[in-house]
A protein has these predicted regions:
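Structural alpha/beta surface segment adjacent to cysteine/selenocysteine redox centers
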Residues: 25-104
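C-terminal cap of thioredoxin/glutaredoxin-like
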Residues: 112-187
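Extracytoplasmic/secreted proteins, especially bacterial periplasmic and envelope-associated proteins
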Residues: 26, 30, 34, 68-72, ...
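Short pre-active-site segment immediately N-terminal to redox-active cysteine/selenocysteine motifs
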Residues: 17-20, 151
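Structural recognition of the beta-strand scaffold that forms the well-ordered cores
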Residues: 14-15, 45-49, 154-156
Length: 187
């Protein structure tokens, strides 16, 4: 989709998140719409690097590897042009920590809520079922460690963490100011 690739003239925000992380859900709820507006206005670009370290840290019986499966599902949704919608649905339906996501949720229910249907649904489900994005998800997760990010959520620009928690407002201009401040190294 537009304005998702880094461009030299605007800040490129990199978000590290784990779909089972409750604080990631809070950040998505609080700052997600502002970030999307800034992307649509061409004021920032944004990359999401999905982690799945919580898969090893919390019991998820019987829904093992929930964060990894959600990361692969989100990548499959992107392949059919529905990343934004699917990403939003994942967080809107985040289970209580330790419960995890079922395959039914990830491949059927969330796809429907994100508006994936017809041939796109068949493509999405095939990509999910064959784990087509397993390597992509693994590489995305590995970038977190390579960047020295110790936990999620982390919003980073030019290698500097954006200090969102100190903001007085979550309106797009306030968020943009925080991004620009971090980008220039003055936060």
């Amino acid at each position: 989709s537009k304005n998702t690739q880094p461009a030299g003239d605007v800040p490129n925000v990199v978000v590290y998140e784990d779909s089972q992380c409750p604080i990631c859900k809070d950040y998505e709820t609080q700052y997600g719409n502002a970030m999307l507006q800034l992307i649509d206005e061409g004021k920032i670009t944004l990359e999401v690097r999905t982690a799945y370290f919580l898969d090893d840290q919390i019991e998820q019986t019987p829904n093992k590897k929930s964060s990894q499966r959600a990361a692969m599902a989100a990548a499959a949704a992107d392949a059919v042009g529905k990343y934004r919608e699917y990403h939003k649905v994942i967080y809107e339906n985040q289970p209580r920590e330790g419960v995890g996501y079922t395959d039914q949720q990830l491949r059927v229910d969330f796809a429907a809520k994100a508006g994936i249907a017809g041939d796109d649904l068949a493509t999405f489900q095939k990509l999910y079922d064959t784990k087509a994005y397993a390597d992509f998800a693994k590489k995305s997760f590995e970038t977190m460690g390579e960047a020295g990010i110790g936990g999620t959520p982390a919003y980073v620009v030019n290698g500097k963490k954006i200090n969102l928690e100190s903001l007085s407002s979550n309106d797009p201009q306030t968020v943009l100011t925080a991004i620009q401040s971090a980008a220039s190294g003055s936060n």
